[in-house]
Amino acid sequence: MLFRSPVFPYQMTTRYEITSHVTGTITIDGETTVVDCPGQRDHSWGVRDWWQFPWNWTAGHLDDGTSFHAARSIIPQLELFATGYTIAPDGTFAEAAGDEIVVAEVVTDPETLPVSSRQRIGEVEFTSRPVGHAPVLLVAPDGRVARFPRAMCRYETPDGRRGTGWTEYNWPEGWPDLLHRA
């Protein structure tokens, strides 16, 4: 696989994020599939306490060539972190932080899987609708539990652009009900 990126990886202290275009082939059980699509690479070297607080991670690509990524804590009246970026179709990179990254109106089903949400990263506002889920139940050695619903999503902006990507939520048990239930 070849990952071509329009910009240098967005680096944080213990991780990096990079929007890419992925080409190559994958062979499984003798069947080869050609890959030619937008992608996202991220890697983390840091220690993660999944049971500490709720957060959201989102990355996607729109049909006009816009790419975006953000991660932020989701705690009412408390901001622990909020960081991300957008890349315009012409390759212009814009960092986003703090109140430039909004996760709002997260609607979940009875299993705590996301049904929809409204988000904004910098100047890019969009709604997300999951089309496939890959949830993970995280259990700490001391018994604490966090639900980690991950979803492949379709995105749509108010001006009609559409795209696809991935969103993840981390919902540790014991936090107040921060969600809208479907």
Per-region residue spans from a language model:
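Structured soluble/peripheral alpha/beta segments that form catalytic or ligand/cofactor-binding pockets
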Residues: 1-182
